[in-house]
Each structure stands twice: as structure tokens, then as C-alpha cells.
Amino acid sequence: MSDLKRTPLCAQHLQLGARLVPFGGWEMPLQYSTLTREHRAVRTAVGLFDISHMGKYTLSGPDVLAQIQRLVPSDLARLQPGQAQYTVLLNEQAGIIDDLIFYCRSPEHWVVIVNGATNDKDRRWLAEHLQGVHFDDLTGTHTLLALQGPAAVETLQPLVDIDLARLGRFEHAQVSLAGKPAFLARTGYTGEDGFEIMSLEPEGIALWQSLTAAGVPPCGLGARDTLRLEAAMHLYGQDMDESTTPLEASLGWVIDWDKPDYFGREILLAQKAQGTERRLVGLTVEGRQIARHGYGLFDGEQQVGVVTSGTLTPTVDRPIALAYVGKPFAPIGSRLEVDIRGRRAMATVVKRPFYRRAL
């Protein structure tokens, strides 16, 4: 018998003909039709993802803000109720435990969404370092859906009781959706406009059925990965982990340098002053071969980097990758060779993201 966990929507995925695969301890849909068709649906119109495997918590208490401030380099005190912040959990060595989003409902009440594969680790870390904070794990009782694409607003607006045009990027609200309560955020992992919707299991299943019955195509992990990679969004465990700092991972923008006290601060200040020995960069690769996770990057016979993520992008229609390279090779325009199963292909360091949506 499989030890893989299933989301509450697994029966829906099977009915829609999804191909299920293991992912971070879960059995998740890889695709329903084809990866390219699902990818292009999100880029041109709208698509629906089940991301209920992601960890979902609420944190509350009079001292909760001060407690969570110690764990991240972003200044969460800047957030107003209804705003959200993408950031990273850091250990004492400034290594990235996970990337996650904090949603401020009030200074005493927060919603937190973490990666599914790191849910258990994150929960243990938070329990160890949050004292006197009420922690409620919603992962087993709530679904999380992502409706993504340029048509997301017009698709969702008839079902919700607020004007979605007034909900800005990285803002959230408690809403009535199809007559039922839901937590709605204008966030996503595709590089497109869209929403992530958390609700109790029965309401989430009903919403999924309603949207797919209305013609919204379901999309799987395959398209989610190519979409996020075009947008140069990191995947934890591939593009960063506890051995990398935010500056090495090109996530310096999440750091508030005036913030006085958090795990790893002195290490990050030293890296800011001295620079890092390696950095995550974007690459385009000549030809049609894909530079995949773990492939080496070379300057002549010297290995100077390693690929962390790569794909043949449906939108740009060329191989792209994220990779760590040594500092001398990080500038835009640097030329390297990637070893693809014993053959070399030329790669160029380029500006990220590889795709940026029209505003």
C-alpha cells in the first residue's frame, strides 16, 4: 500500500484523466492533457491547479509578530492587514529552511503557506522557535486552489462578493465565494495574474467542480514547473536549500537591511559587504537539448557551476535554466558550456525572468 498522501481532490483528478506522480510525499497530478497545452492555457487565458498539498497554518497571539520577525529577513511589521509578503525562513547560518508567504490578517493573526515537501520540517522549526503562539495546522482540513492566467479575474468575479479589481498583488481578503467563506489571495507561482483560494474541504471540492465544469482547464505539476521557471521563480530543494543563503540564491530583495535582529543577519551583512562566491543566474542554452538539474557548467575544463532547474520553455521555445555559478561568471553575457550527457552546449547568462507578463 502506498505511503503517499492524497489531497481531497484526488478523486476529481482521476475522473479528469490525470496522470498522478509522487511529489514531496504526495500523489499529485502531473498533467491532464499535455504539459504544453496546460502551460499555454495559463499564459493565454486561465488554468486551475490543486495545490492543497502545501502547508497551511494560522499563527495567533499577542506576541506573534515579534516572534516571527526573528525567523525571516523581511520586515513583516511593514505589512498592513490584508497584505502579504514572500520571504524565506532562515537558520542560524542564514541557510534557507524554506520559502513561504506570510499573510497579515492583523498584527496578532497571520496565515502562513509553506511548501508541501517541507511542511513537516517547517512545522517543527516553527514549533521550536515560536513561544506562546497559538499554532493551527489547516493542511488536513482545507483545500488550496490556484486559478492563474490573464482571464482569472473575469473567471472568478461572478462567484465572489468583492470587486477583484480592488484586490492588489500580494493582497488578500476573507470573502464569500459561491456563498461559502474562503480566504482569497492575489498570489501565484506562474508569472501570471491570478488567485490562490483556501477553503474548507467540501467548499474546495465544490469550487473545483464548478470551475472545471465551466470549462476552466485543470493543470498539473508539469505546467506549474515550466510556468514558474519561465518566471524565474525558485523551487525549494532544487534552486535553494539550507546550504544556500538568500544572497547566493539571488533573493536579496527579500532582505530588509535595516531590520535589527533575525537569524543569520551577521552572515548576510558580511556577504553583502564582501560578496558571495557563487550566485544563482539565468541561462539560455543553444540548440534544443535541456540542461537539467545537476548538470555541470564549464569554462574550458574547469567546472564553474551547476544547473539547478532547466526546461524547454513552451512560451519562449528555447532551453532555459537556473544555475549556480562562480562570481566571475555571474555577469550578464557570460558564456559557459553545459555538459549534457557527455556533450557540450553553449550557454549564456541572461537577465531574469525569461518571461514577463504584459501589464
UniProtKB/Swiss-Prot annotation:
Enzymatic reactions: N(6)-[(R)-S(8)-aminomethyldihydrolipoyl]-L-lysyl-[protein] + (6S)-5,6,7,8-tetrahydrofolate = N(6)-[(R)-dihydrolipoyl]-L-lysyl-[protein] + (6R)-5,10-methylene-5,6,7,8-tetrahydrofolate + NH4(+)
Top-rank EC class of the record's enzyme: transferase
Keywords: Aminotransferase, Transferase
GO cellular component: cytosol; glycine cleavage complex
Pfam family membership, one: GCV_T
Any one GO molecular function term: aminomethyltransferase activity
Cystine bridges: none
GO biological process: glycine decarboxylation via glycine cleavage system
Coiled-coil residue windows: none
EC number: 2.1.2.10
Superkingdom of the source species: Bacteria
Family affiliation: Belongs to the GcvT family.
Oligomer and partners: The glycine cleavage system is composed of four proteins: P, T, L and H.
Function (record text): The glycine cleavage system catalyzes the degradation of glycine.
NCBIfam families for this protein: gcvT, PRK00389.1
Name listed for the protein in its UniProt record: Aminomethyltransferase
Organism: Gloeobacter violaceus (strain ATCC 29082 / PCC 7421)
Lineage, top ranks: Bacteria, Bacillati, Cyanobacteriota, Cyanophyceae, Gloeobacterales
Gene name per UniProt: gcvT
